[in-house]
């Protein structure tokens, strides 16, 4: 779902405020003194029940809430209070409605039986009309229609086939879900439903969020179009008014949130898509006559007005219900004024409805053998899906349970021979913490607890993706204020800030789990569920992937992984591991620079320089630029031997240093700059050139006889070394590649101590001295 920025930023604070004050807006209601020309009406609504037959929670004071049997009692009590306040009213004046997601993402007690126990409970509680939520599409609308119709099936095994199902009398309205290319509402559902109360007609229009294509398996929505919410409301409200129906209620699976203080008794603001929907509808048709909207999908408290339209929502999982009351004018056929409402907790301080309890207990008995089976062990009582247990300023969106689930998917895919690199799953598919039971001093994981974590049964697909597409998918987490995000296995990444208000963070770097950088042009195998493969939750990058193969559904995969660990004698020890790490841009810049300099230092070997050498050679990073200059104030840049003095594909380089006229003792600075612009310097001291030894023998062309001292003469007047091994003259150096260290960056350089050189170091001064002395003696002899 998309939610406006103010809504997203205020969700947590306002929800807490709503809980703290008990969820109650002033209940003005109708009374026994209502005028005879008006009709009292009560609308009791729930949303996002998700098969929560016995799910317990707590209110702001810590008191227990939740459970279908308690909800039945509390709804009956609310109706009785309404009837007592309006003696002329009957139960026909009290209507029970729902705003979608009654089924799907359900605990085992309902989910294992295809949510048929939930449909039975709603039938017993007399819910008269409702709409679709995204989870009604989880297994396709035909399957939801089968559940409504109470039709048997042999598709899901014996415990489902044997369940004593019932046909639902509840009308389903879904005006903006139509068969593709038509205006016909899908699966024979209705665009609206009209109920007449004491001569006044009330219309109920059904609306589903147009985000459904991003929330549901592509195969389950391919046959439908989802029409604009506001335009559909305007269309059918006009049609209803044409039939004399002026009191109009919209049952919408569209998110909303109150932004005011419900305790003030004054008009409250409402934010979110439901508010935007009604604002647009009012602009399109100011006379649309919509008096009430029941919202859903984002599981929040809502109770406020948009114009003259009341918008309500009552959390999720049966924690609370909306109690809306008003008066209908018999003359106009409309509400006298915007209806009043209060959001009431489903408290457990009442006596639970025995009939509903019996349905739940029957369902539990049918699945007991399955859900109570111990399938594994854990090292703690709860493995949490919480991504920010320490309340850090920046939530990294990594959870210990998310790590366990994706590790399980990667493990099981590889066990099946798929040879995958990574696994990713949408966090919305993780429906509860993994709880354990203490038995024999151990934390046992049951089948039911595991199923509650991954209840959807989405097919796991092994797909091939490029590194670039993986990077795109990771970045898509940071759109829409991280409403949708991923849990990952096999890779790690760092994210940092951006200046984009709609994209607060970006992925700075990605590596595999062993630290190898992700290559954007390389293809990887990734395990994802078919929901993500269809671009679910807005992750369009996954739609670019190519299907390789499929493995078991996510529920079975998770359960079988836990069983495998138990069979191997392993206790599960899931934890957060820093797979997603936030760093500031300054931290990233420093780390990037340090890593680049380290890489240059490790790759660089420079051969030694001696006096009058013509080239400097060595190896460094391929593509790096190499420059050489004398380390003096008047240094001149050396001429490069190759274009731009760039190291070749093997990292080899050669720089022409003839122009530097190197002399012994010169300080030479070599600067290496990598292809990304990071550089460091290396310093060396030019050493003396190797001495050119004189030849031995006749005319200085042979080695002579052997063993005279340096500078002596042989019998033929030739000079020799006296060692019998003279060589032709010339400068020599010994290649002894040496690297140095540096702390330079793209904007500055620093260097280390001089680079040592080796080689022959015969003193030329001695040779010249001998020559001069000999010449002087010869001149003196001639003069004498």
From Swiss-Prot:
Residue stretch(es) of the prosequence: 759-784
Subcellular location: Secreted, Cell wall
Bilayer topology: Peptidoglycan-anchor
Gene Ontology, cellular component aspect: extracellular region; outer membrane-bounded periplasmic space
Lineage of source species: Bacteria, Bacillati, Bacillota, Bacilli, Bacillales
GO MF annotations in UniProt: 5'-nucleotidase activity; metal ion binding; nucleotide binding; UDP-sugar diphosphatase activity
InterPro entries: 5'-Nucleotdase_C, 5'-Nucleotdase_C_sf, 5'-Nucleotdase_CS, 5_nucleotidase/apyrase, Big_6, Calcineurin-like_PHP_ApaH, Metallo-depent_PP-like
Keyword Aminoacyl-tRNA synthetase belongs to the record: no
Keywords noted in UniProt: Cell wall, Peptidoglycan-anchor, Secreted, Signal
Extent of Gly residues compositional bias: 697-729
Region listing for Disordered, in residue ranges: 690-761
Positions carrying Pentaglycyl murein peptidoglycan amidated threonine: 758
Signal peptide as annotated in the record: 1-34
Stated induction or repression of this protein's expression: Present in both exponential and stationary phase (at protein level).
Motif (LPXTG sorting signal): 755-759
NCBIfam families: LPXTG_anchor (TIGR01167)
Name of the protein this chain belongs to: Cell wall protein Lmo0130
Biological process annotations from GO: nucleotide catabolic process
Source organism, top-level taxon: Bacteria
Alphabetized Gene3D superfamilies for the sequence: 3.60.21.10, 5'-Nucleotidase, C-terminal domain
Pfam entry (one): Metallophos
Stretches with biased composition (Low complexity): 730-759
């Amino acid at each position: 779902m998309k939610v406006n920025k103010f809504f997203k930023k205020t969700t947590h604070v306002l929800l807490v405020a709503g809980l703290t004050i008990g969820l109650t807006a002033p209940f003005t209601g109708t009374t026994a003194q209502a005028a005879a020309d008006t009709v009292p009406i009560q609308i009791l609504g729930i949303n996002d029940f998700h098969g929560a037959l016995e799910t317990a929670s707590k209110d702001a004071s810590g008191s227990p809430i939740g459970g279908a049997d308690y909800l039945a009692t509390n709804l009956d009590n609310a109706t009785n209070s309404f009837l007592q306040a309006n003696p002329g009213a009957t139960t026909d004046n009290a209507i029970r409605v729902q705003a979608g997601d009654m089924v799907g993402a359900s605990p085992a007690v309902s989910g294992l039986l295809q949510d048929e126990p939930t449909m039975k409970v709603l039938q017993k509680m007399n819910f008269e009309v409702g709409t679709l939520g995204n989870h009604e599409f989880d297994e396709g609308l035909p399957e939801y229609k089968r559940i409504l119709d109470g039709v048997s099936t042999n598709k899901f095994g014996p415990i489902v086939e044997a369940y004593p199902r019932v046909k639902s009398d509840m009308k389903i309205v879904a005006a903006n879900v139509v068969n593709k290319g038509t205006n016909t509402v899908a699966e024979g559902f209705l665009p609206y439903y009209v109920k007449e109360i004491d001569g006044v007609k009330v219309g109920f229009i059904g609306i589903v969020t147009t985000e459904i294509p991003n929330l549901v398996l592509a195969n389950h929505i391919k046959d439908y179009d989802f029409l604009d919410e506001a335009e559909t409301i305007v269309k059918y409200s006009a049609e209803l008014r044409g039939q004399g129906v002026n009191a109009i209620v919209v049952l919408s699976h569209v998110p909303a949130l109150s932004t005011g203080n419900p305790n003030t008794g004054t008009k409250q603001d409402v934010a979110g898509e439901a508010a935007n929907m009604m604002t647009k509808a009012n602009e399109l048709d100011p006379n649309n006559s919509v008096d009430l909207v029941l919202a859903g999908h984002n599981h929040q408290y809502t109770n406020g007005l948009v114009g003259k339209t009341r918008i309500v929502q009552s959390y999720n999982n049966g924690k609370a219900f909306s109690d809306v009351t008003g008066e209908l004018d018999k003359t106009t056929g409309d509400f006298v004024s915007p209806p009043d409402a209060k959001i009431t907790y489903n408290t457990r301080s009442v006596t639970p409805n025995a009939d509903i309890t019996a349905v739940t207990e029957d369902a539990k008995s049918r699945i007991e053998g399955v859900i109570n089976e111990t399938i594994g062990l854990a090292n703690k009582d709860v493995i949490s899906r919480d991504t920010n247990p320490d309340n850090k300023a920046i939530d990294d969106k990594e959870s210990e349970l998310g790590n366990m689930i994706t590790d399980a998917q990667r493990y099981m895919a590889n066990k099946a021979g798929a040879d995958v690199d990574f696994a990713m799953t949408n966090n919305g598919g993780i429906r509860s913490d993994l709880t354990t039971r203490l038995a024999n001093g151990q934390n046992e994981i049951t089948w039911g607890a595991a199923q509650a974590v991954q209840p959807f049964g989405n097919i796991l697909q092994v797909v091939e993706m490029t590194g670039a597409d993986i990077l795109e998918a990771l970045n898509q987490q940071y759109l829409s204020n991280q409403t949708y995000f991923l849990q990952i296995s096999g890779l790690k990444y760092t994210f940092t800030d951006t200046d984009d208000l709609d994209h607060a963070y970006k992925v700075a770097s990605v590596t595999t789990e062993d630290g190898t950088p992700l290559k954007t042009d390389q293809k990887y195998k990734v395990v994802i569920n078919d929901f993500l493969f269809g671009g679910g939750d807005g992750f369009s990058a996954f739609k670019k992937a190519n299907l390789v193969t499929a493995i078991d559904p996510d529920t079975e995969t998770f359960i079988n992984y836990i069983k495998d660990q138990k069979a191997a004698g392993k206790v599960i020890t899931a934890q957060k591991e820093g797979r997603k790490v936030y760093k500031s841009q300054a931290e990233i810049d420093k780390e990037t620079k340090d890593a680049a300099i380290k890489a240059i230092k490790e790759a660089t070997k420079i051969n030694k320089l001696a006096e009058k050498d013509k080239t400097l050679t060595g190896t460094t990073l391929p593509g790096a630029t190499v420059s050489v200059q004398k380390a003096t104030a008047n240094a001149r840049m050396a001429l490069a031997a190759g274009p731009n003095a760039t190291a070749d594909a093997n990292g080899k380089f050669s720089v022409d240093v003839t122009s530097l006229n190197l002399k012994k003792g010169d300080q030479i600075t070599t600067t290496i700059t990598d292809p990304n612009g990071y550089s460091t310097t290396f310093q060396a001291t030019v050493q003396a050139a190797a001495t050119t030894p004189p030849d031995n023998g006749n005319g200085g062309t042979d080695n002579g006889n052997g063993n005279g001292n340096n500078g002596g003469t042989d019998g033929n007047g030739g000079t020799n070394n006296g060692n019998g091994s003279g060589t032709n003259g010339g400068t020599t150096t010994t290649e002894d590649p040496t690297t140095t260290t540096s702390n330079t960056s793209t904007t500055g350089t620093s260097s280390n101590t001089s680079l040592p050189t080796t080689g022959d170091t015969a003193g030329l001064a001695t040779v010249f001295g001998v020559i001069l002395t000999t010449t002087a003696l010869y001149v003196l002899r001639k003069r004498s």
